[in-house]
Amino acid sequence: MDILTNFIWIPSWSQKDDCEAKIVYFRKEFVADEMDLLNTRTVRISADSRYKLYVNGNFVQEGPQKPLDRMEWFVDKADLQPFLNNGINIIAVEVLRYPECKVGKSNVNQSLLRTETPVLYVEDLMGNQEKSVSGKLGWKCCINSEIEIIGEENPAGPEPIHAEENVIATDRFAKWKMVGYDDSAWEYSSARNLFEISATIAPFHLVPRTIPQMRHENKSFTEISAIRDAGESETKYLRKAYLKMIRGEGNVRIPANTTQIVEIAAKAEECGYLLYEFARGRGASITTLCSECYAYPQPDVPSPLGGMVQTIPKKGDRTDAKNGQLLGHISYYRVAGYGTEDMAEQYEPYWFRTFRYIQLKIETADEPLDFISFSYRSTGYPLKIGTNVRVSDSTYSAIWDISVRTLARCMHETYMDCPFYEQLQYAMDSRIEMLYTYAISADDRLARQTMEAFRRSQRPDGMINANAPALNSGVIPGFSIYYILMIHDHMMYFGDRDLIRKHLPVIDGILGFFDKHLLSTGVVGKIGGPLLLHTYWSFLDWADGWSTGAPKCSMQGTGALTLESLLYLYGLQKAAELADYIELPCIAKEYRKRAESMKTAIQQTCFGVYRLKDGRQQKLLQDGPGMEEYSVHCQAFAVLTGMVTPKEGKEMLQCTVGNKDFAQPSVAFMFYLFRAMEICDIYDETDKLWDLWRYMLDKKMTTCVENNTDERSDCHAWSSLICYELPTLILGVSPCAPGYKKVRINPHLGKLKSVNGNVITPMGNISVSWFCDSNGKYKIQYSLPDGMECLNDVSQILVP
């Protein structure tokens, strides 16, 4: 039996190598004839941890898809044929290996799982042994020791991406992806046998990717935003020279022993692979700082753990290059100097960067540097927008544009909280981002991967991880309920019963966890606390005044939080509907019974009477049982869970929303407030809430802010609320039966004079147009796809 496999690695790999992030190059020469150029040439390829595949210097694809756990590993197929030449060809692979072991915080990428066995897997499916590029037939390989993978230089916190680089380049790897490169000093790879490789990535555990390859699009920067530390005439000259360079109209020659600082802008916030091209300039140093915006740094403050920590900078006009500074992540590159105008020295960092602005600090040594080109290859999930809505208020259209862009920037091989800081897939964030995706594209491929990642993250106590896939365990109890809502949302849009059956055991475990933590009063007890001070983090929202992400009462009395009881109640209600849909009436009945008990317990222990400044008294839900602390959040979920009637909910919301006496929701929680206002028939009052987004436009943002309290990141897709509201509420198209078999058309025009558009659904396109005729009366025109029923008689809808 041949126990050698197509899993290969470099023989000289040491134990020290296995505790650092490393990049390893692989290349193989092979011959293709005219017949090969006419036929598909498919290989299967994977790696631990990441690969980039090239043929004759041309980028083909990257992968594998991020693993969801350590039980399976994804494998890709790639067609080499479009890149082949008649004669000698080179297939080349860059593998980024993150260590399985952890040394402090200096070598980890928190969302990228790996095994104990570094490998590259290549299997040629052509079948011709003489021309095969399969791994076990021999490749040349070499560690690129010139590249050091470093963290994000955050002394006060985690470095969850760990993909910055410090490069001291030489000509050793110049043109290594091309035919003619001398690899005689490289090692021959060794093929792993079946007993050497991890069971996770054994051939029988390789599974095809479940999402499409990421998109790649070559783009140019658009303007020079600033030249630093130069006189007036030099600034004018350099601005013109660098502008020509980024437009592809000329080079910039930087004299020897010179320092230049240039700040370059993209049209909008981007995720992309930076590409530099140089000629000459041996020993020049390029320091690259990627930033989302211009900001105003604040003084460091004492840390509770000792020492000083950086504070989040203040932000205003994001384009204020005159008064603001660029702050962000830094990488370093020292130029080798072998490049010419005809054959430039090229550098492309391995991981994509997130940026709107780039600061380049260029310090030449003893010879001048010719900066030939600086551009990027935009990347992300291939999101195709099928929904478009046109309204009479131009600010809605502008908010739509920045929101769609934000969602796109937060979609890669997973949903991401923010692509700049963390690149982690959290349950609360992802739930509404998935809904936004359904509403504008009817694409559930990434959503299915997301739900599966959380399903596999379940712990023995029933909780799922707050983010998944994840290298480390961490629980935010309420986030497990958002996972249940994900499954319910998918039911309404796609109606996949098999998916629900697969996830229901995990849902039951989550609900069981909450049930085990009920107090004698029947409400959920203290199940979490502040981050790092409790086993679980009871995060609810980044509301102003909630420094730990939860009300102050979480550290008072019993520590129980009403909102966690409400989330449990909401989860029971939605789980009952899921059980109904897959015809499990006994389970549905059990969930509803527990839900009614929870409603009774909340009713008896969590309501208080708040005295308003005008002397009136208002019945409100407290943030904690018996605690005189109140928020909009609890009033909104009282409506969503049916704790109060729509009339009562209207009074509660109108009392608290916008009232500074009560904790107000950040943009992260605004989706749930909008749903409550919809139920209470005060949706028209949401217009003033859009002022948060109008503020973003006023501050010249091109994406939506992470939160409106500290504004840490300028790009976080839980803020892409209008992607849901515009088609679903304002245009009025929403599913009201599983699988979108039935639709409700119920517009909320508010102050708008007209709205029309097309909404893509899994069943097909729905077109709707509302307009005011010459007599001042509203009219409707609409069309539905075959097989879809409109639940309400739209001709009877009265639009104010």
Model-derived features with residue positions:
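Extracellular/oxidizing-compartment recognition motifs
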Residues: M1-D417, D429, R445-L446, T450, ...
